Amino acid sequence: GYQDMKSEYQKMIAGEPYHPFDPELRALSQTARQKQATFNEEVDPVKGLEIIKGWFGSTGENLYVNTRLVVDYGVNIYLGENFYSNWNLTMLDVCPITIGDNAMIGPNCQFLTPLHPLDPDERNSGIEFGKPITIGKNFWAGGGVIVLPGVTLGDNVVAGAGAVITKSFGDNVVLAGNPARVIKEIPVKEN
């Protein structure tokens, strides 16, 4: 029936196997490359942020993204209010990447949603899939943090420089290492 007629884009954002060379996805990717190039060459940060606001799935009113941004599509990125990112932010958004209010992202951080089949024949066939990344409010990532596909983080999470976050964690924790683990609980004042 009609339910079987999902587009490759719909399959992709749902985390189902999809063909990345689908014409609709190629066109979306090409548009993203053009916007990425325009943003990365823009010297005026106000103009740069207008590009991001008109491109990403959603953003807060107040945000700052430094240049050397790399994304797959951009349209699957949802940022809360007061988002800040330093240089070289990579967000590979084949599935949605959602980050809550007041995020501070250090340089060279990567948010990676794409996955490939482990079986070599399946992988070589070109089929891909992904898993979304969802992060709560008040996230602080030091330099070089990597967040892998399918990770959900709660509120008030701090990730130390170089942390590789391979699985989900709750609220009020400091993560460090590869693979990242909780090295400290954060005592939060009751409002």
Model-derived features: positions:
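Flexible, glycine/small-residue-enriched loop-and-beta-strand segment within the central core
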Residues: 69-153, 178-191
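Short-chain dehydrogenase/reductase
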Residues: 64, 140, 158, 174-176
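Conserved catalytic segment of ABC-fold P-loop ATPases
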Residues: 154-157, 170-172
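Short hydrophobic beta-strand element within catalytic cores of glycosyltransferases
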Residues: 164-166
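Acidic, glycine-centered active-site loop in nucleotide-sugar glycosyltransferases
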Residues: 169-171, 176-179
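Terminal amphipathic alpha-helical/low-complexity segments used for targeting or macromolecular assembly
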Residues: 1-62, 180-191
